[in-house]
């Protein structure tokens, strides 16, 4: 019999006959949450673990731990290809960087986890979904808004937030009940990772003057001492990477290989203070070698293939898209509408981009496409160019006519002393 912490309170409104599905990571907090939830509600707990390329332990190891911690069932899903195809690729097409920096590493993994949580709830007859988020972060919103959208009839609970269950209490509970989980406090950071990148926060980093120490990095090598430059050719079809150096690969494989190659060069390190959805600013360290390399290459191919006015408007759409996804609105009507526009812009984003990876930078030095708008004969300054320069004078006169007319008006009003 698991020993209940004396400070734990019962959830109201969750009948003891209910089954509850729990978003399970295999870590301390969610392992302990299995017992906490059972004690607080009397319900059976089904642990749901979703592999989005976070690495580490096998799904079977995670499944066995969940069962060892008291779950009656353990639903595990290898969602790596699904995550790459349906979540990372739309993010790439949008060139999505929240506040110009963050490639939405954690934000885009939550919707796929939500999808499997709701699927598991239906499969096992659960009426409630639980997650291990605190009340201070963005993920609580992402999980609960997503669950409300995909499963409006499902209830949501968050034991760490709702019952004020601290890490010290979690360690005490795990040790007292001999749960099969490591309980040391050796890692002071909060870490979330998947194939699109890695996020590190809290601890020493909360003082925003402190420089990150080398020990917090895992996906990237120190860029100050790089190996020889690594040149890669990334091939795209309709905005999606389909090959690397001429070898056909799936999106997942492209991301994984660029994580390895760009990571070895220290590409993709981001140190930023960002605005959280809950109204506070937070210092975050990100590593996204594959994601940042792909976004860089993709943007350069767009520069060649997308018409100017469409490209300008897409930049605005991409910013709003990133904000929606960061704010937990992956399944919202507006985000779906923006997806339609973004997909339309990608019709001609096909071709090859040559990228040099070196010393923390992914720099583009070559572009090749059959669907581009770059016309050598129009662009060249050499003899034989097809650009008719005689049309420039009239174009300039008309282009500046509005400003010229306004200036003439301003000077006339100023000279007469009239009020505008």
From Swiss-Prot:
Recorded metabolic or biological pathway in which this protein acts: Amino-acid biosynthesis; L-arginine biosynthesis; L-arginine from L-ornithine and carbamoyl phosphate: step 2/3
Binding site for ATP: 23-31, 132
GO cellular component terms given for this protein: cytoplasm
InterPro entries linked to this entry: Arginosuc_syn_C, Arginosuc_syn_N, Arginosuc_synth, Arginosuc_synth_CS, Arginosuc_synth_type_1_subfam, AS_cat/multimer_dom_body, Rossmann-like_a/b/a_fold
Its EC number(s): 6.3.4.5
Reaction equations catalysed: L-citrulline + L-aspartate + ATP = 2-(N(omega)-L-arginino)succinate + AMP + diphosphate + H(+)
Superkingdom classification of source: Bacteria
Pfam families found in the cross-reference section: Arginosuc_syn_C (PF20979), Arginosuc_synth (PF00764)
Compartments, record wording: Cytoplasm
GO biological process: argininosuccinate metabolic process; L-arginine biosynthetic process; urea cycle
Main location: cytoplasm
Keywords, sorted A to Z: Amino-acid biosynthesis, Arginine biosynthesis, ATP-binding, Cytoplasm, Ligase, Nucleotide-binding
GO molecular function: argininosuccinate synthase activity; ATP binding
Annotated residues for binding of L-citrulline: 102, 138, 142, 190, 274, 286
Binding site for L-aspartate: 134, 138-139
Assembly information from the UniProt record: Homotetramer.
Protein family according to the UniProt entry: Belongs to the argininosuccinate synthase family. Type 1 subfamily.
HAMAP family hit by this protein: Arg_succ_synth_type1
Protein name per the record: Argininosuccinate synthase
Natural source organism: Renibacterium salmoninarum (strain ATCC 33209 / DSM 20767 / JCM 11484 / NBRC 15589 / NCIMB 2235)
Species classification: Bacteria, Bacillati, Actinomycetota, Actinomycetes, Micrococcales
């Amino acid at each position: 019999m698991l020993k209940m912490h004396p400070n734990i309170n019962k959830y109201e409104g969750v009948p003891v006959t209910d089954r509850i599905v729990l978003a399970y990571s295999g870590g301390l907090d969610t392992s302990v949450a299995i017992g906490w939830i059972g004690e607080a509600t009397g319900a059976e707990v089904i642990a749901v673990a979703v592999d989005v390329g976070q690495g580490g332990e096998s799904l079977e190891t995670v499944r066995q731990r969940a069962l060892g911690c008291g779950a009656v069932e353990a639903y595990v899903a290898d969602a790596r290809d699904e995550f790459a195809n349906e979540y990372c690729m739309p993010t790439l097409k949008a060139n999505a960087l929240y506040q110009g920096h963050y490639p939405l590493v954690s934000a885009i993994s939550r919707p796929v986890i939500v999808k499997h949580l709701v699927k598991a709830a239906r499969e096992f007859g659960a009426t409630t979904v639980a997650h291990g988020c605190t009340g201070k972060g963005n993920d609580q919103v992402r999980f609960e808004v997503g669950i409300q959208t995909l499963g409006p009839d499902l209830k949501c609970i968050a034991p760490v937030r709702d019952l004020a269950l601290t890490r010290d209490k979690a360690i005490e509970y795990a040790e007292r009940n001999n749960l099969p989980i490591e309980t040391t406090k050796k890692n002071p950071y909060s870490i979330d990772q998947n194939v699109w990148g890695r996020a590190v926060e809290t601890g020493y980093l909360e003082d925003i003057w402190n420089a990150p120490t080398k020990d917090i990095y895992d996906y990237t090598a120190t860029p100050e001492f790089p190996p020889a430059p690594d040149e890669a050719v990334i091939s795209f079809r309709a905005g999606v990477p389909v090959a690397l150096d001429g070898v056909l690969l799936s999106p997942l494989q492209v991301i994984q290989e660029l994580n390895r190659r760009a990571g070895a060069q220290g590409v993709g390190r981001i140190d930023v203070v960002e605005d959280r959805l809950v109204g506070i600013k937070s210092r975050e360290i990100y590593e996204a070698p594959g994601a940042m390399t792909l976004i860089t290459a993709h943007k350069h191919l767009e520069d060649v293939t997308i018409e100017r006015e469409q490209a300008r408007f897409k930049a605005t759409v991409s910013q709003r898209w990133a904000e929606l996804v960061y704010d937990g609105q992956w399944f919202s009507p507006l985000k779906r509408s923006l997806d339609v526009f973004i997909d339309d812009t990608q019709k001609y984003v096909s071709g090859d981009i040559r990228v040099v990876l070196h010393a923390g930078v992914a720099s583009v030095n070559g572009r090749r496409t059959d669907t581009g708008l770059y016309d050598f004969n129009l662009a060249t300054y050499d003899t034989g160019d097809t650009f008719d320069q005689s049309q420039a004078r009239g174009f300039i006169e008309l282009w500046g006519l509005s400003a010229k007319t306004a200036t003439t008006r301003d000077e006339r009003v100023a000279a007469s002393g009239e009020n505008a």
